[in-house]
Structure formats: C-alpha cells, structure tokens
Amino acid sequence: MKKRKQASSDFTFAQLPHNRKEVFFDCLKLRFGTIVCCGLLLLLFLLPLITVEITYDIVNLNIYNSLIGGQMSETQATLYKNELQLYTSLAQIVCLCIFAVGLAGVARILRQLVWGEPIFFWVDFKRGIKQNAARFIAVFVICALVNVASVLCSTMIDEMPIVGYIPLGVLIFVAAPVALFVLSQSTIYTVGFSKAITNGLAFYGKRPWQTLLFTLLLVLVGLTRLAPISALKYTLLLLGTVFLLPMYIMAWMLVSCNVFDEVVNRENYPELYDKGVYRLDKQ
C-alpha cells in the first residue's frame, strides 16, 4: 500500500489564501488534477466544434488550391468562401449548445473549488447541468446568432465598410462581456434571465477593462482560425482546452466574485462575501 506523505508541520492560518489571487494559485497547486479532469470534460463537449473547425480548414484549403490551380475564378472562390463561413457559423450554433451543457457542469465544480467547498465531482457536474444548462445554452445561442449576423455583414464590407463591422463590434464589446457575467452569475445566484443581463451590464460597467481583457483572450483564440492547417495547430488547441480553458474559467470566476462582493454581496448576500478567502484582518 502506498504510504501517504505527511506535512512536516501543522497547517496554519497564515498558509490559507488571503485574497483571490492566492486562491487561484492554491487551487493550481493543491487541486491540479481536478482542474485537468475539468479540462478533459470540456474537451469532450468541445469535440463537435473542433470537428467543424477542422472541416472548415480542409474545405477552405481546397478552395485556395483550386484558385491557385486555375480551376475556379477569384469571384467563384470568394462566393464559396462566403458560403463556407456562413454554413460554418450556423453549424457552430449546434456545437456551442453541446459545449454549453458541459460548461454548465464544469462551472459548478470550479465554483466549489474556488470557494473551498467539498467537491463530489460527478454529483456536482450533473447538478450544474441540471441547474444551469438551459441558461448557458441561451447565452451561447444569442452570441452565436450575433456571430452569424457578423458573418453575413462581412460580405458587405466592400460596399458598406462601417455596417459590415457593426455586428462584430457588438459581439466583442457588448454581447461577449455581458455574457461572461451572465454565466458567472448563473453559477452562483438564482436570478431571472433578463435580470441577469441587466446585472451583467452593470457589472461590466464596474470593471470594463478587466472584462474586456478576458473577452479579448477569447478573441485571440478565435484568431487561431487564421493560422494555416497543421497538426501543431490542433495539438495546441487540444492542450489549451485541457489545461488553459479551466484555468481561464476559474480566473474569471474569481474576478466575478470580486465584482459581486463589491456590488451586491456585502449587503445582500453576506454569506457569499469573501467566500473562500481568509483575510488576515478577520483572524
């Protein structure tokens, strides 16, 4: 039987996390295996979307080769690319709904993790899906539809440059930031969908630059589509999903908790204020 390691000294209050930055690194140090398991679950639910992206890359490469080989004109290639982008964005709606289900379960596990609460992995995963899957699906569908509008309008950029970029701007600077707060709210509070959106706008106004930073990190992931098709590209995507995505979600959960503490928790939800944090002045 494997002998368990024992600490050389008793655990003291000073070793507990005193702010949410310390909570993040404590979770990485002490519960890395749980975080990786969450990443593997996210990868499982993200596989349909990855499959769509691989198909997009292959078809796009075939269009490019046909254009270079003189088998189609530049006008035909542009038409095919526009159709490919539209069909891909429509397929992404279904794929994102599938991913939203898995994310709802994982988000609850990571919430328990940053709160320092006991984790019953599969029980919490199923409970998160039961409680939040519908809300998460609704959020992803709205963002995906804005993306479809962006793809449609991108075909008008040459004729109407400003109009062509409006949906993309709405997605990056309005829909996605508010959606991030709607998702984190839904993991913690019981609140109506319209109220969650209203709250999301208010929270976004409290921390605009932090929120935009997290949004732009998602945009950078989206820009990987511009990279040429290669085994390295998809290997990095798979590894990023398993290791970096759950860390991103955990970091956003902690940022959200800071905002919630500042705006609502101190007065309305004192039991949630500084949850998972052991301030030195509270000793």
Where are these regions (language model features)?
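Membrane-interface helix termini and inter-helical loops of multi-pass transporters
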Residues: T155-E159, I229
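Generic alpha-helical transmembrane segments
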Residues: G169-F181
